[in-house]
Amino acid sequence: MMNNQKLPSWLTIDADCALIQLSRPATCNGVVLDRLRMRAPTVRDVRTAHKTAGGDEADRELQLFASLLEVGQKDLEELKLVDYQRLQTAYFRLVEDDGGFAGAAA
């Protein structure tokens, strides 16, 4: 399904990653950052997060995002809610299939 919605000004997406501008600086891995880079997930990323979360969907998402962002889970728990919601939006936009890959083989 094609999504024609305009991206928010705080979000940049390409085929491999999303760059998320935070509403305020946050400390991740001991470094103060004003944006985070989320790489596109693999099937392995999703399966690993699902296995280690033990059925807890919120924990599964935190583990998955921590892996994709290469930050600690505790760092994500310290984000302001608005910034965590930006991560959620970025994730769903990143995995969305818009059918637009021109190099796909038939």
Identify the meaning behind each predicted range.
Residues 2-106:
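Short, surface-exposed, charged amphipathic helix/loop patches that serve as local interaction elements
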